[in-house]
Regions:
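SAM-dependent transferase fold signal centered on methyltransferase-like domains
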Residues: 1-395
């Protein structure tokens, strides 16, 4: 293990490749570890803990966690140490050296008995569990290199009723409108390259997963999502119910965006109409999830239990709490946002502060909020033309 070094992340000791801490792009050899994804893992630990606090284990099943692309175990081992309600953690990877390293890290943390390791292709690993519903995993995490789309059905078939799936996508160019045909093939919808493409991307992941789930008689409900320059991540609660699965289309629709005047709106129906403001052709993204993205009651409970004022002195915890705080107030029933810069550009003037713009929109009778997707973004049910009129009047 000369090429590895011991670090501590959260409360967990990890053996990680030295090169992954020294190089700008973490190498895949001898095993992959991304130190920049710590925020991703920290957020996950909070979500898993609060989910299991509210988890209704009526069948008294053993609570299990599956890390399908486990790598060196950075997520799965942290769950074993930092999520006490989980009884068994299954860590899988195709890289034998990564699993050997994960086993060594498990020994360092004295959690050998809680961890089961396997070296297998992802779908073979997931379906290796008995198919009876009471033998499925409570939580399944899918964090592949690139698109999660080839593995979604395997994940859905391996998770129990009322369980949780967490999914990461790193094919950012596809989901951000650069390769639209690829996006349509993988995510059943068109992406778009504009200021709010990261929210469109996140909603495409939710919608494509929900459509596959519906075919299996499974309904999904987002409890939290977030994005980073390098990835998009969603947490979805699972309900095995044909009647609920039939309702999936109630939460699907299309976003129409005018690149000329900045107008945007959304509809449940696909239509190639023209912009009502400037008569230009709309660019359409979707079919995508237009429903809500956050379980705000759960997030409020999370903040109260784990991120009280006394626990937020740490800079990382402050950043995480800020994300959760914003999500609680976010207008997540609106599937896009505006940015301060684009509003300033349309007005041909220096933009006002975000808080001031939100205040003026609300004072004019509209709803408005910040968004988790961009520090300079705002959500509102006002149109771009409404926003510009409001800000011009109040200058």
């Amino acid at each position: 293990m000369d090429n590895f070094i011991q670090i501590t992340e959260g409360q967990t000791k990890l053996l990680v490749p030295k090169n992954s801490l020294q190089e700008k792009v973490p190498p895949h050899y001898p095993a992959f570890f991304n130190p920049l994804a710590r925020l991703n893992r920290d957020l996950s630990i909070y979500i898993y803990n609060i989910f299991l606090e509210e988890y209704n284990n009526i069948k008294n099943n053993q609570i299990t966690f599956a890390d399908a692309f486990g790598g060196i175990g950075s997520r799965g081992l942290r769950v074993a140490v930092e999520v006490p309600k989980v009884s068994k953690i299954y860590i899988n990877d195709i890289n034998e050296l990564a699993i050997i390293t994960a086993k060594e890290s498990a020994h360092l943390n004295n959690i050998d008995a809680k961890c089961i390791f396997s070296i297998n292709e992802v779908c073979k690993f997931l379906i290796s569990r008995p198919t009876e519903r009471n033998k499925r995993f409570t939580i399944v995490d899918l964090d592949p290199f690139g698109s999660p789309s080839p593995f979604i059905e395997c994940v859905l078939r391996s998770v129990e009723d009322e369980g949780l799936i967490s999914i990461t996508a790193t094919d950012t160019a596809v989901l951000s409108g650069i390769y639209q045909n690829v996006c349509l093939r993988k995510y059943f919808g068109l992406s778009i390259n504009n200021t709010y493409s990261n929210e469109v991307a996140t909603r495409l992941i939710v919608s494509s997963t929900a459509l596959i789930a519906a075919r299996l008689g499974i309904s999904l409900r987002p409890i939290f999502v977030h994005s980073n320059r390098h990835y998009f991540r969603v947490f979805l609660k699972v309900s095995i119910s044909n009647s609920k699965a039939n309702m999936v289309f109630d939460n699907l629709g299309y976003i129409k965006h005018c690149f000329k005047c900045g107008e945007r709106n959304f509809s449940s129906i696909y239509s190639k109409d023209l912009c009502s403001v400037c008569s230009s052709k709309f660019n359409i993204s979707g079919q995508l999830w237009t429903g809500k993205l956050f379980d705000k009651t759960m997030i409020l409970n999370l903040i109260k239990k784990y991120l009280s004022d006394d626990s937020t002195n740490d800079k990382k915890n402050q950043q995480i709490k800020q994300l959760f705080d914003i999500s609680v107030d976010e207008l997540d029933d609106i599937p896009y946002y505006f940015t301060v810069d684009e509003i300033g550009s349309m007005l041909r003037t220096s933009p006002k502060k975000l808080s001031k713009i939100i205040e003026e929109i609300i004072c004019s009778g509209y709803r408005a909020s910040r968004t988790i997707f961009r520090p300079t973004g705002l959500k509102t049910n006002a149109s771009m033309s409404d926003i510009l009129s409001i800000l011009k009047i109040r200058e």
